[in-house]
Amino acid sequence: VKYYFNKDFEITNMVESFLTAKDEFDDDIILSYSDILFSQKMLRTMMNSDEDFSVAVDVDWKKYWQMRYGKVDFDTESLKVNDKGYITSLGLENPPVDEIDARYVGLLKFSKKALMDILDIWNADYEEYQDKPWQQSGKTIRKAYMTDLLNALIKKGRYVKAVSFEGG
């Protein structure tokens, strides 16, 4: 496990923090939010994914969300999945509950090829979106959420696989 420090953490967000480790993008990587817990089985499943972009999602989210927040119809980590298991949209604020297939967990796997795609998209958009919204969150590119990055990948035609778990 390697740790990286984003010296600009106070004026940026998670994607820019993630990209401080770009010198390590020479093989597949697992990326995890620092505030989540997951089982070894979940980690192994993610590690064994053959997809370029793999995202752990919780398909059994409603009970937990109701308990935690008292409602289930808000958030920016909701997502929709097509019949082949690929995410078609995510990060929409307050989507209709019947349009939520799962919730984003914060555990991802990117192949080496995927990492190069991420850098290409990031570098192409970086200057243009310094002072205007980049994706659905309305944040500038330096303050982008990981869901913004995933949404950018989907918009650019990349296939982002939802790796489903019950609980997450």
Protein language model features and the residues they cover:
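Conserved core of the sugar-phosphate nucleotidyltransferase
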Residues: 40-125
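Conserved N-terminal catalytic core of the sugar/cofactor nucleotidyltransferase
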Residues: 1-28, 140
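Conserved beta-strand segments of alpha/beta enzyme cores
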Residues: 2, 86, 159-161
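Conserved alpha/beta core of the MobA/IspD/sugar-nucleotide pyrophosphorylase nucleotidyltransferase superfamily
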Residues: 97-168
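Short beta-strand-to-loop acidic/aromatic patch adjacent to the donor-nucleotide binding site
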Residues: 27-37
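Alpha-helical elements of Rossmann-like donor-binding domains used by nucleotide-donor carbohydrate transfer enzymes
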Residues: 20, 45, 148-149
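Conserved glycosyltransferase catalytic-site signature
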Residues: 14-15, 36, 143-148
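Short loop/edge segments at beta-strand edges and connector loops
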Residues: 5-7, 33, 57
